[in-house]
Amino acid sequence: TTNNNNTKAVPEAKAALKQMKLEIANELGISNYDTADKGNMTARQNGYVGGYMTKKLVEMAEQQMSGQQR
């Protein structure tokens, strides 16, 4: 078996995750993230998007686990 960390646990969530990534990039002031060449962006910019997205996903999971909904 291949250990591919990019494989989605829930493939149906792909569109929602992409939309969330775009919204987070926009919140961080990166307005054209969907069409931007990620190779021309700094590691810091790309890291902010991924890190903030992870933070939001963890918050959502914690809320769901505690029975709270926003």
Swiss-Prot record:
Keywords: DNA-binding, Sporulation. This is Small, acid-soluble spore protein alpha. The record marks E23, I24 as: Cleavage. SASP are bound to spore DNA. They are double-stranded DNA-binding proteins that cause DNA to change to an a-like conformation. They protect the DNA backbone from chemical and enzymatic cleavage and are thus involved in dormant spore's high resistance to UV light. Belongs to the alpha/beta-type SASP family. It comes from the Bacteria. It comes from Paraclostridium bifermentans. GO terms for biological process: DNA topological change; sporulation resulting in formation of a cellular spore.
